[in-house]
Amino acid sequence: MIRVAYNNQFGGFSLSNEALALLSEYKGIKLDNYLASELPRHDSDLIKVVSELGNKANTSISSLAIKELSSPYYRIIEKDGREEVVEPELNGFIKID
């Protein structure tokens, strides 16, 4: 199961101080919001932090959510800070492993 973190409100993707501290602990390096925003949104530690903290991971400009993907492909589309996770329509395609 692949999961992706995204921001579900206008404002922008950002993590609370508590979430940044926990993510930094998991990663073993000091992260700020800029560095955390460079992580892939499917990063397992990021998903773990958002899952564990729930609303405590949010800031005044973010409402973080997690989407489970049906395939290993996704794109995040952002408008005014609000994000949508989009998966391609792959029905009928054959995947070579």
Pin down the residues of each PLM region.
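Catalytic phosphate/metal-binding cores of nucleic-acid and nucleotide-processing enzymes, i.e., regions
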Residues: 2-96
